[in-house]
Amino acid sequence: AKTLVISFIGMQSQEVSIKPTINIVLKPDTETLDEVVVIAYGTAKKESLTGSISVVDNKKIEKRITTSVTGALEGAAPGVQVNNTYGEPGKAPTIRIRGFGTLVSGASEPLYVVDGVPFDGNMAELNSNDIASMSILKDAASAALYGNRAANGVVLITTKSGHATNKPSITLQMNQGIYNRGIPEYDRLDADRWMEASWMAKKYAMMSNKGMSATEAGQYATEHLITESIGRNIYNAADNQLFDANGKLTASRLSGYDDLDWADAIERNGHRQDYNLSASTSGEKYSIYSSIGYLKEKGYVKATDYERYSGRINSTFTPNKWFKGGVNLTGSWTKRNYNDNATGSYYSNPFYITRYMAPVYPVYMHNADGSYQLDENGEKIYDTTSPYLGNRNIAYEMLFNKEESIRNVLGGQAFATITLPLGLSVTVKGDLNNSTSNNKKYDNPKIGDGATNGGRLTSYAYQYRTVTLQQILNWNYQFKEIHNIEAMIAHESYSWERKYTSGMNTGMAVDGNLTMGNFLTNSYFNGSDDEDKTESYLARVKYNYDNRYFIEGSFRRDGSSRFHKDNRWGNFYSVGASWNMKNEAFLKDVEWVDHLKMRASYGEVGNNMGVSYYGHMALYTIDKNGGNPALLKKSLAAPDIKWETTQTVDVAVEGRLFNKLNFQIGYFDKRSKDLLFEVRLPLSAGSYPWQDKVMNLTQYKNIGTVSNRGWEISLNADAIDSKDWKWNIGVDATFLKNEIVKLPDGKDILHGMQNYSEGHSIYEFYTYHFEGVDQLTGTSLYTLDPEQKVKAEEAGALVNINGQDYATATSYAQRKWAGSALPTVYGSISSALSWKNWNLNMLFTYSLGGKTYDGSYSSLMGVSESGAAGSAYHKDILNSWNGAPAGMTETSPNRIDPNGIPRIDYYKSSDLNATSDRWLVSSSYLVFKNLSLSYELPKKWMKNLGIEGLMLNAGVENLFTLTARKGLNPQYSFNGGSDDTYVTARVYNFGLTVKF
């Protein structure tokens, strides 16, 4: 022999001439890397898999610009949905795998496993540069060994280890970027158009409420709009001389009012910097990977940022043939400044203010001529006199208020594997994770929530500890070179603990000292301890005949502290099989078939996340009654509740054809039964007649069955594969059908605008139907509830048009099914183009079908003089009804305009713009998720500098988002809701990677 072929799994093979001494450095090979994937409690060759597993390698992760590594899952695999995407600094996105298997939204999160043990921390605390791969386990065959928390899928995250080279390598990565809003704001009226719309609203309010004629109401609106409704005049005319008789603005805005857009005072261009230094080495008996990282983000909203220091050491040692051990250490320190009120309809929510503040209220105080009022230092004075804000100013408050969270995380893992005769091996692993979180919320004494009590400081302190212990016995055996058996039995114990204390003091003594001792009056102090424990026994058997037929079975028995001792244990299992058809004689010589495989599996996995830590017990709230200790019953005992169980069928075919086209087509059917739900009890059961639902008496119950079924299709092709040019294009699609199969006694459970009902999706809208606008009166019409006809007539809310009755208020309207929030199909489109050392990658994500209740648009289309004076309007309000069309009569066949916009009327706005399907809009979207360009300098240029490689890269995350309406964020939630909060950020990044 004259040549020698050197190969290693995950590395490119090399052929070299035989010499007495040979030095070989193998390069990573992403295609070969696919041969071995991380699975539950081990690894396996990809061709042997009987379950549905998608792998995201570090090459794909490195192209993405995300703080949380889970953000890289978006668009990376079929069956995976990602919402709440990158916007708030330090916030991880929300992930769903193959639908929604429970009625409790927080209980649909997948299980995250890092280096073989469950991870309960914040995913943003993991350094993405330390991640080698992520395996997404989507069916029961792949996930059943994590039985107790695998019902919603599992994401296995594997961190990097020392690589196979003959010398240490060092990698330095530096990234700088800026980011801002990735979704534009809604189209709203400017100051002049807003004034005219408000005049019209005042006019119609006088007509409907006071019975004035159109002329009288118009004159009244001109004379009283400023004094009664707006409370601010920024024009060069007297309050009662701003409009003509038709409501057209005749005055001009005073010069100097250039501070009417509150977004300018609250938002900014954010900044992102990310630095990582890693070292890797390995030898015959050891491998070591270490890294340190620093990340700093300034949010696109002022006073928000995120800072992270991270470090990791992963080491393995093999002193002899029969022993292998390792120790992994990781730690992070994070600091996050945030706004805890960045959701909802609150004056302390900056997003609420920037969206709804009418464009006639300035940020700063102005003189009568429009010029700024200045303080003794020549600085602008913040305006705290706006009637809309109730004498508050969010831009002013954000200068002084502070909300801060500091977390410290330290984790360690040690393992040892002893290889025994007869193919046996024993592995013992222990993992300990400790973290502390100290949160501080300061409200200043000058303005806002702290102004009435001299300032206040709230402190929250959390301590977490997670311990996981595993003992695993493996057996691998082969006979006659075609029979391969792998077996495993294991035991695992999991323990989670949390200690929590909080308190609030008021009355700040010394300005600027944000410690509890500097606030002299205690308002409250409380705390709690929680724990969650699981004990598990598991086993797996795999059989492979001649690399053609693969059979696998697994079993796990879990005991959870969340259930009563009589129902504590749950049994979960899976069976799967696959057929590698390419290895059959009838396909071996078919050149255009490179790979062809069929697989099928069935299994049952569990979920206990829908019940609290002590859900089976009767719980009491500890409080005071007249200054004395008191107990208030919070929930009834539920000794009969048991595990949610998800039964999954998975069938797929995959392959590669013509040495170009990779494909995978699969069908899945997940049925989750015995769903856990916290039922609020009626007064007859001992509940309390309080408005606050938190204080209602509850009891956990297993109440129903939900089905998620659909198809996953994945295609990618090597369109060009030449020496210098390579181009791979891909597309994947997931078709999902969600359905409630069973509820107790078949009874519906109404919740908000949606309804749990057999035969419908868990996120299907069930709300009042908007019939259209009466073109004679400009009134909104709704489908009448026949049982409410008499009451509607008595209230003057009944209209008969051409023989059909309609309600003019939803109090007498009928609810109807109005479509689901869930999409019909979602997926991604990708392109990877390379020419020599240049690489250009693009990723698009899309979703088709589904509806969102656009509450923000609804608020911008409604007007109300009481409680919301000065609220901004959407530009569509200009198309509202303003008088009956010519020739319109009571019997006109087109009297109802189904797409009309009702009149704007301060007095009747709550009925004209009531909650209904009028505000439902398509959730379909297309996002240019990622664009990245990189160039690797030729190695010969770097050789004399002692540099192994140097790569320059530039990228954009969330380049644009196309939706049905400008301003809409369809990825805010899975349930079709919306809020005034963070939207996806557009991130521009420039980076440099140097390898030594």
Language model regions located:
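A structural detector for beta-sheet-dominated domains
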Residues: 19, 25-29, 83, 98, ...
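Switch/connector loops and helix/strand junctions flanking conserved nucleotide-binding motifs
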Residues: 46-47, 145-147, 165-166, 180-183, ...
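Extracytoplasmic gating/loop element in the C-terminal half of outer-membrane beta-barrel translocons
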Residues: 252, 449, 560, 847-946, ...
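Glycine-rich, aromatic-lined ligand/substrate-binding cores of catalytic
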Residues: 820-855
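Conserved small-residue
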Residues: 171-252, 720-821, 861-865, 872-896
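Extracellular/periplasmic, surface-exposed regions of secreted and cell-surface proteins
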Residues: 61, 108-109, 308, 314-323, ...
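Short, small/polar-rich motifs associated with maturation and membrane association
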Residues: 1-312, 317-326, 332, 411, ...
